[in-house]
Regions:
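Acidic, surface-exposed loops and disordered segments
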Residues: 1-256
Length: 256
């Protein structure tokens, strides 16, 4: 089955080289409006979006986000932050803490945002970000997610003057495709390894071998990690890498 929306989703690729054409205010507004129409828990909209066009700020982010120069070349960056600050400010200004103390026999207890609150806000944030991605794509504007914004929490908190209960979730680079841009599509896992009916399916060793057959072809014996197979190489490059540890550290700091 095909339609314009499905084609837009399925033809989208991460874009790291951008045309010289600027993103117009009208285009940007359309993207932001689409983001804000994303599904949200209880209509709380537990996120904020910071529009970044200042070149100096983009240069700083290109370094703090794992030294990726293309970030500075994107016409517009959108920083999506999980935001419990606004609601908890609203609670404080309207005596919610005092209300909880008055009604404590009913089980009310006013607390700062918990881990689950950050997860819920992160869900809202990423749904909004993906709406922005699809809206931009429909306008001929490419995008690239930068997960490294989760790193270096203290630096980014200061750079963007983030108050308590606000945490960077994703940085989105936006820019027009260059004429005749060659879209390179990366193969996804077979749906049978991702989509399960009714309950989770634990893969067998044989199924894991089949699932990762194409990925394992990327293994190189001369890899810099001295890994003996693809799984070891990928873990060293991604899951167990220093940037991943820094993400975890930043996350823990934000929760304090």
């Amino acid at each position: 089955m095909r339609n314009q929306i499905l084609d837009c989703i399925n033809n989208r690729v991460s874009l790291r080289t951008y045309d010289d054409r600027p993103i117009t205010d009208e285009e940007l507004q359309a993207v932001l409006e689409a983001a804000m129409h994303a599904p949200t828990a209880g209509n709380q909209m537990l996120y904020s979006i910071i529009v970044i066009r200042n070149q100096e700020t983009k240069e700083k982010l290109s370094k703090s986000c794992d030294n990726q120069p293309f970030i500075a070349k994107a016409p517009v960056l959108l920083l999506f932050v999980a935001d419990q600050h606004k609601w908890f400010d609203f609670y404080k200004k309207n005596g919610v803490k005092e209300f909880c103390e008055e009604q404590k026999e009913k089980g009310y207890c006013f607390e700062a945002p918990q881990e689950s609150d950050l997860i819920l806000a992160a869900e809202d944030t990423m749904i909004a970000a993906q709406n922005a991605v699809i809206a931009a794509e429909s306008l001929g504007i490419g995008s690239c997610y930068i997960g490294d914004i989760v790193e270096n929490y203290e630096y980014h908190q200061k750079l963007f003057e983030l108050p308590e209960y606000v945490f960077p979730i994703s940085l989105l680079c936006l820019g027009h495709y260059k004429p005749n841009h060659n879209r390179v599509f990366r193969k996804r896992f077979d749906p049978k390894f991702v989509v399960f009916e009714e309950k989770y399916h634990q893969l067998s060793d044989e199924e894991y071998d089949e699932m990762f057959e194409e990925e394992c072809k990327k293994y190189r014996q001369d890899n810099p990690y001295k890994a003996h197979n693809y799984a070891q190489m990928f873990y060293a490059r991604k899951t167990g890498a220093a940037f991943s540890k820094e993400m975890a550290r930043s996350f823990r700091v934000a929760l304090k």
